[in-house]
């Protein structure tokens, strides 16, 4: 499928680019899986690095965004029971979605 092949090509270019960038890890396929790379994302060192990355990229015309807003941080759910969400918070404070367009020739 051309669509998925194009998405995977974009991801491969990101993987190559970010492999030599310190403190930034590009999300890649897990072993024995084949991702369609619907969204591309990077993991940064901490919340401060995430904010810096978002500011720098968006200020320079590259549209990036945090991976998600946690539901327990939304006013209507802030009093709902949860287990502390340690792992979820770790990712929310570090992951940034980067442009994931399709380029079909």
Model-found features: residue ranges?
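PLP-dependent aminotransferase class I/II
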Residues: 1-105
């Amino acid at each position: 499928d051309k669509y998925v092949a194009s998405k995977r090509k974009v991801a491969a270019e990101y993987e190559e680019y970010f492999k030599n960038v310190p403190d930034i890890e590009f999300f890649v396929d897990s072993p024995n899986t084949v991702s369609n790379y619907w969204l591309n994302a990077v993991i940064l060192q901490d919340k401060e690095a995430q904010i810096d990355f978002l500011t720098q990229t968006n200020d320079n015309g590259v549209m990036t965004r945090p991976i998600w807003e946690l539901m327990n941080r939304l006013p209507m759910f802030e009093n709902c029971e949860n287990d502390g969400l340690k792992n979820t918070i770790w990712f929310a404070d570090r992951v940034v979605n980067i442009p994931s367009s399709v380029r079909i020739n």
